[in-house]
Amino acid sequence: MTYISKKQAAKKVIVREKPILVRLKLIIGAGTASMTPPLGPNLGQYGINSIEFFNDFNTETKELFETGLALRVILWINVMKAFYFELQMPKISNLLKEYYKVECEAAKGGNVYIEKERLLKDCFKIAILLCTFNKAEKQWEQIEKKYLRITVLEILGTCRSCKIYVKKAENE
């Protein structure tokens, strides 16, 4: 799934008028793009205005994601050095690791145990993000409940593959 803002959609029309020079696939932390290597030199070799890219990227991603979350970005550059970028949905495993960073670091044996309510709440947050990623104008009432339920079940399956399990209650 890709997301392109209205500003980037307008730039896309301009960029696509000329032949495309390069399409770059990058992984950048949300709101943390800067001139430091490897990103700065990588953009510099194509001659684009990197300061403009960093400002655009940081302002758009700060609104949508937590700072530092690894995002996949596709950057299109044409022969006139004009550019636009598309954001791709972060991997679910990356989102889960971001939510449970402290627990993953403290885990023994690689298995992470989370309370049932917290795990379901976080899975619903990720599912809502997935359902609304392409359609930023969608609100909670517009999300179809059956797709949300299916998405939550998929995320719970991803939790299992990432070794994130439900903590058993002590009274059971």
UniProtKB/Swiss-Prot annotation:
Gene Ontology CC, one term: mitochondrial large ribosomal subunit
Family matches, as CDD domains: Ribosomal_L11
Annotated protein name in UniProt: Large ribosomal subunit protein uL11m
Primary location class: mitochondrion
Lineage: Eukaryota, Amoebozoa, Evosea, Eumycetozoa, Dictyostelia
Assigned keywords, A-Z: Mitochondrion, Ribonucleoprotein, Ribosomal protein
GO molecular function, one term: large ribosomal subunit rRNA binding
Gene of this entry: mrpl11
Protein family per UniProt: Belongs to the universal ribosomal protein uL11 family.
Pfam family, one: Ribosomal_L11_N
Compartments reported by the entry: Mitochondrion
Keyword Ribonucleoprotein: yes
PANTHER family in UniProt: 60S RIBOSOMAL PROTEIN L12, LARGE RIBOSOMAL SUBUNIT PROTEIN UL11M
GO biological process, one term: translation
Entries under SMART domains matching the protein: RL11 (SM00649)
